[in-house]
């Protein structure tokens, strides 16, 4: 039986979050064993924030949750791809559909999308 290898990165694995319909990469985050199990049990994506040192469910503040459609692991069992139905307009905390909205072009990084919501309004702190 395949076991996910959490040892290579100090208890964490990268989780690539992908739109299940069109294959767009929405975000990359980190999971530990607890958040992977929460994701598998609840059908919602859960992550471990390295900067805040806490667990979080995608959309818990914004309402832009992710419904898990399929989970895959790579040949080394140390990374997962989670295909999701994105509920709400955007996966990125900046308000963009994807966290990957900046493209290398003509020797510089260029933003290629506009936010779909105002983060200052959504994340009132």
Curated annotation (Swiss-Prot):
<feature type="binding site">
    <location>
        <position position="78"/>
    </location>
    <ligand>
        <name>Mg(2+)</name>
    </ligand>
</feature>
<dbReference type="InterPro" id="IPR038019">
    <property type="entry name" value="PRib_AMP_CycHydrolase_sf"/>
</dbReference>
<comment type="similarity">
    <text>Belongs to the PRA-CH family.</text>
</comment>
<feature type="binding site">
    <location>
        <position position="92"/>
    </location>
    <ligand>
        <name>Zn(2+)</name>
    </ligand>
</feature>
<feature type="binding site">
    <location>
        <position position="99"/>
    </location>
    <ligand>
        <name>Zn(2+)</name>
    </ligand>
</feature>
<dbReference type="GO" id="GO:0004635">
    <property type="term" value="F:phosphoribosyl-AMP cyclohydrolase activity"/>
</dbReference>
<keyword id="KW-0460">Magnesium</keyword>
<keyword id="KW-0963">Cytoplasm</keyword>
<keyword id="KW-0862">Zinc</keyword>
<keyword id="KW-0368">Histidine biosynthesis</keyword>
<feature type="binding site">
    <location>
        <position position="74"/>
    </location>
    <ligand>
        <name>Mg(2+)</name>
    </ligand>
</feature>
<dbReference type="GO" id="GO:0000105">
    <property type="term" value="P:L-histidine biosynthetic process"/>
</dbReference>
<keyword id="KW-0479">Metal-binding</keyword>
<comment type="pathway">
    <text>Amino-acid biosynthesis; L-histidine biosynthesis; L-histidine from 5-phospho-alpha-D-ribose 1-diphosphate: step 3/9.</text>
</comment>
<keyword id="KW-0378">Hydrolase</keyword>
<dbReference type="GO" id="GO:0005737">
    <property type="term" value="C:cytoplasm"/>
</dbReference>
<keyword id="KW-0028">Amino-acid biosynthesis</keyword>
<feature type="binding site">
    <location>
        <position position="75"/>
    </location>
    <ligand>
        <name>Zn(2+)</name>
    </ligand>
</feature>
<dbReference type="GO" id="GO:0000287">
    <property type="term" value="F:magnesium ion binding"/>
</dbReference>
<dbReference type="InterPro" id="IPR002496">
    <property type="entry name" value="PRib_AMP_CycHydrolase_dom"/>
</dbReference>
<feature type="binding site">
    <location>
        <position position="76"/>
    </location>
    <ligand>
        <name>Mg(2+)</name>
    </ligand>
</feature>
<comment type="subunit">
    <text>Homodimer.</text>
</comment>
<dbReference type="GO" id="GO:0008270">
    <property type="term" value="F:zinc ion binding"/>
</dbReference>
<dbReference type="InterPro" id="IPR026660">
    <property type="entry name" value="PRA-CH"/>
</dbReference>
<comment type="function">
    <text>Catalyzes the hydrolysis of the adenine ring of phosphoribosyl-AMP.</text>
</comment>
<protein>
    <recommendedName>
        <fullName>Phosphoribosyl-AMP cyclohydrolase</fullName>
        <ecNumber>3.5.4.19</ecNumber>
    </recommendedName>
</protein>
<dbReference type="Pfam" id="PF01502">
    <property type="entry name" value="PRA-CH"/>
</dbReference>
